[in-house]
Every structure is written in structure tokens, then in C-alpha cells.
Amino acid sequence: HDQLIGMKGYGEGALKMKGALSNLDIDGEVYLDSAYLVSVPYGISMRFANDPVRITDSKLLFENFMMYANNESPLNIQGSLDFTNIEKMMLDIRMRAQNFLLIDAKENARSEAFGKAYVNFYGAMRGPVSNLKMQGKLDVLGNTDMTYVLKESELTTDTQLDELVKFTNFKSGKPVVVERPALEGLNMMLGMSIDESAHILCALNADQTNYIDLMGGGDLTMTYNSVDGIGITGKYTLNNGKMKYSLPVIPLKTFDIQDGSYIEFNGDPFNPTLNITATENVRTTVNEGQGTGRSVDFICGVKLSQTLNKPGIQFIVSSPNDATLQDELNTMSIEERGKIAITMLASGMYL
């Protein structure tokens, strides 16, 4: 499966050729039937419309040519492939698609990403086939629902509680590594807008019991070249969502992600910077001595910072409606507040 891109299917038609073999002039028409553009390493299969394609003066003409991925909304292509010089074939096409189902992947044991991704796309690709330049705009639509599994994620705290917070995958068996050849000769720049209704679930372990369920949006820029590979920059702001999180001493909790949390991409698409605060409300009795106590509402949770590969986790607690207790919490160090937060999350008590 070294081949990056190939074609399968049937085509029939008539061609007229004249001139020297080194400089053929070709005219004619080809009818495609059940023809596909496929990339085995990347799991892509796109069906060509069963339409005639004209060849004029050694130019393959795309005239409102349609390609289909996973639904009946086509990618529309206009332009030409000029093979007057076989050694230097030139492509010049414009592409557009609306509500295009770009990804439709079911979960399996090797899945890193699965679900459905719907997009609008406008773009152009130009240049010699060996050195193409692509620019465009990709809008990820609100009906998108994707899951991304971080199988190797190991989250640790930046307080003194390191040993409490480790995720380990105990499943045996060596993972299967899929070798994907690099895309040679392509320079790409895509503006990406993610609709605020798009739903992306980021699983923090292989069995998906710990996860961050993201609702949000943002504007990102995605670049690709064969030297640097793929890069993403921009900010994905969270306006909603849940985080499910368990620790050796804390039962599985569901926290609410606070508005204004965000994920910022600085190049590496697999290692963004995190700024996520996720909390839950806890009501508990605070002992005032002599066996008396009063009921207090606390906001308790976790704050994720630093990068996805090496995140910092801080446990947080506050009592916004009780000034006396809040003053008491303010005098403590981050570590002391963290221990109070962990105790509260584990036992429901303020100690």
C-alpha cells in the first residue's frame, strides 16, 4: 500500500491522436462508469459522477465535474489538466462543495478518529502536478459529530499530587502502526471555520471513560508542505461541554466546562495548548465547632493548562456565596486548596 493515490473503475470512449510521440495532440471523450479516486493509506474513496469528460488539445476538461464521498452532496470541479507536455502536466482547477460528508468513519479497535464531519469547501489547486499549490476555505458545519481517541494520553498534575493522577492503559498487545506515505509536491493553506454547534468528543483514554466533550467553535489556519508536514494555528473556544474524569481516589465525575475555556493550536495539530476550567457544584456542611455546622455551596473542579502531551492539572475550589470561607481559602497556597478540592471531590466533605 505504498501508493498514495490511485483510481479504480471503468472508462470507455474514443480518442484521436496526432503528432510526434513527444508532443501528441489528443482529442476525444471518455465516459466514466463506477470509477473511484482512492487512497488506501488514508482510507479515502471518492466516486466520480458517471459523466463524459472531454479532451481537447491534450487538455482534460472538468466542466461542472462531480465527485462524491459519503453522501449525495457532490464536490464540484471546474478546470483542466493539461498534459501537452507529459513530463510537466499542469493542473488548474476550482472546487466547491456544500454539506459535503468528508468523514464517515465507524469505530474499530484501531480508530483514532471516527464519526461524521460535514463541511462546506471552496478552493483552488494550480501548478505542475509534481508541485501543486492549494488554497481554500473549509467550514466545519454544525451537524458534525466526531470522536478523537488519545490512546497514549497520560495526564499528570503540576501540584504535589502527581501519583494520584496517572492514566495508564493496561490493555496488552502491541498497537498496529499504520504507515502513511507523505504527500509529496503539495503546498496547502486552508482557512478553517468551525461552527459553534459542531460536536467533538476527545477521549483521554482508550476505553473512553475519561473524556472532554467539546462544544465550541473558532477560526483556524491549516497548512501543509512535504518538509514541515501538517500545521494548525488558531484558537478553538469552548462555549459548553462536559468533562468526565476519574482518579484513583475520586469516583468518575462529570464536570461542566466553563465558558471562555479554549484550546489554542500553535503549529503541531496533536499538541495544542490547553486552557480549560471544568467544575461541579458541591453543597456540604462546614463544621463551626461545638458540633454545629452550616451548609455551604462550593464550586469545585479542575483546571487544565500547558500542552496536551504534558498537561498541568490544578484542582480548584471556591465558595463565592460565603465571604468568610472564601477569605479562608484565599490565605491558602495553591497546593493546600488543591488538597481541599480533592478531598471534597472524593468524599463530599470540607476538611
Give the label of every model feature segment:
Residues L24:
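Acidic, carboxylate-rich catalytic segments that either coordinate divalent cations
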Residues I5-A14, G28, L32-L351:
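Strand-loop-strand
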